[in-house]
Amino acid sequence: MGHSVLLINGPNLNLLGTREPHIYGHTTLKDLEESCKEHAQSLGAELQSFQSNAEGTIIDRIHEARGKIDVIIINPAGYTHTSVAIRDALAGVDIPFIELHISNTHTREKFRHHSYLSDKAAAVIMGFGVDGYKYAVDYAVRNL
């Protein structure tokens, strides 16, 4: 197999499909993860998925990826705007990563406009709904 990709979903994304569907859509996290795995396989890559509502658990999973994963795709959700610790973890493992958001955070509340990750990310994908996950997998496998 080619690239190994780790997909990390942050807080509240376990509620996909039911939480604010007018913003996040009706696709469940389970369905989204399966779709991403299948798409990665079709490109000759392997994708692992992980979700947590806890910042420390996300950091631990990033650390565990060191030396084992080629690319990280992360939707840090609310931690985008608050977590220097996740930023530091991503910098510390020296794995290229893609920052991903379902909605366009710049069209939402002002506090969502700042990201602690964007300036370190290889790419930022936002505003494409759950289709952004497919785009992220494509970019990760073909370019990183």
UniProtKB/Swiss-Prot annotation:
One BP term from GO: 3,4-dihydroxybenzoate biosynthetic process
Enzyme Commission number(s): 4.2.1.10
Binding-site positions, substrate: N75, H81, D88, I102, S103, R112
Molecular functions (GO terms): 3-dehydroquinate dehydratase activity
Keyword check for Lyase: yes
Record's keyword annotation contains Metal-binding: no
InterPro entries: DHquinase_II, DHquinase_II_CS, DHquinase_II_sf
Marked site: Transition state stabilizer: R19
NCBIfam families the UniProt entry points to: aroQ, PRK05395.1-1, PRK05395.1-2, PRK05395.1-3, PRK05395.1-4
Assembly: Homododecamer. Adopts a ring-like structure, composed of an arrangement of two hexameric rings stacked on top of one another.
Family membership: Belongs to the type-II 3-dehydroquinase family.
Name the UniProt record assigns to this protein: Catabolic 3-dehydroquinase 1
Organism for this UniProt entry: Fusarium vanettenii (strain ATCC MYA-4622 / CBS 123669 / FGSC 9596 / NRRL 45880 / 77-13-4)
Gene label: qutE1
